[in-house]
Design a protein with these regions (language model features):
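Hydrophobic alpha-helical transmembrane segments of multi-pass integral membrane proteins
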Residues: 1-195
């Protein structure tokens, strides 16, 4: 919020706890087939909390900051994925949709976003503005997510091509990250500080 010069919007303590515990509880219940209907409701509730949080925290100025909007995107994909997983109790095809929203969109996008931020800081480089290749890597990861999610609605050759395209975009995104960041990660910090 300092970066955007906007007030920080605090979350109630119960929201912070629920966004942590509900997804874990859902996963444990689903893994052991314990009260699947209740697990579905927990998953939908968790996804709703994630999605509402994105709405509450959103400012248009976020769009100018790749290091911020990538985190919003990953958090939103995770929330939508949790909702889809919950709805799969009634519409079974939604499970595949939810798994890939969380797997590629949540884990893939958030991991790349956090690696990009933290590695800059820990190598003594400025987070803002990020290297020009970073937003490109971010967009490729988002494209990989969208294509992988859309692949759940097609079959045959279209499905195969979609999977390959998504995997290629995912890989290129991470390769761009590695290409830019590995030289920093194997050298002493740019600012000369220890670490």
């Amino acid at each position: 919020s300092k970066r955007l010069n906007v007030p920080q919007i605090p979350s109630p303590q119960w929201v912070a706890h629920a966004s942590l515990w509900l997804p874990m509880l859902t996963a444990m219940m689903m893994a052991h087939n314990i009260l699947p209907g209740l697990a579905a409701l927990f998953s939908i509730a968790a996804g709703a909390i994630f999605t509402v949080q994105v709405y509450r925290w959103w400012y248009k100025a976020v769009l100018k900051e790749p290091m911020l909007w990538i985190l919003f995107a990953g958090y939103l994909f995770t929330g939508l994925g949790l909702i889809a997983v919950g709805l799969s109790y009634w519409i079974s095809s939604f499970l595949n949709l939810g798994v890939h929203l969380i797997g590629v969109g949540g884990i893939g996008v958030l991991t790349l976003g956090m690696m990009a931020r933290t590695a800059l800081g820990h190598t003594g480089n400025s987070i803002y503005p990020p290297p020009k290749v970073v937003p490109v890597a971010f967009w490729l990861m988002i494209a990989a997510t969208v294509i992988r999610v859309l692949a759940t609605f097609v079959s045959g050759t279209a499905y195969t091509h979609s999977i390959r395209c998504s995997a290629a975009l995912f890989a290129v995104s991470l390769l761009l990250y590695a290409w830019k960041y590995i030289p920093w990660l194997i050298r002493p910090r740019s600012d000369g500080r220890p670490g």
